[in-house]
Structures are given as C-alpha cells and as structure tokens.
Amino acid sequence: MPVEQDGLTGGRGVPHPNSAAGQALSGKTGGSSVPHPNSAAGQALSGGMTGGSAVPHPNSAAGQELTNKNLEEKSVLEGGTQVKPWLKNQPDLANIREQNHQ
C-alpha cells in the first residue's frame, strides 16, 4: 500500500497530462501547440506549409482513375503485350539436363 504524503500517493506531485490540472500545467509550460494532422488546423498546416500529400487513396475514385491511367501507360510502353520480363530468355532446361546426363 503506498504511503500518503501530503495527500499524494507515493509523493509524486505530477498530474496526469489529460487531467484538468495536467492541461493547466501544459498550458503554463508552453505545452504542445501542434494540431492533430487529421484536424482542420492540421490539414491547413500540412497543406499550406509543407505542401501536403496530393496522392489519392488507391480505393477512392481519384485513385482508381490514377491506377487505370498507369495501366494504360504501361500497356502502351510494352506495345500492348503482357510479357513478363522474367519469362524472357529462359535457358532450355531440358537440353541442359540431357547434356549433363550424357
């Protein structure tokens, strides 16, 4: 059982940061005035100061359009064929086995 000293258990006089006393303390010491990134203030901060991230979520409509555009560009670059580069220039394993067994 902790020993009470001046009404505080364990003698620690530090309030929890989320309590009213902790909030008042963080307000006095300057605290952390950084808004949450998902809040309106955080969005304004990331969009205004750092440029933010303009990449849409892959499952959103804008993300789907981007994915489709990338697929179209790939097929144009590859001549419209779906050739996998790792399947090109494969050695003839049957011939190599025959040569090794002779």
Curated annotation (Swiss-Prot):
Stretch list, region Disordered: 1-102
Gene Ontology CC annotations of this record: nucleus
Protein name: Uncharacterized protein F08B12.4
Species of provenance: Caenorhabditis elegans
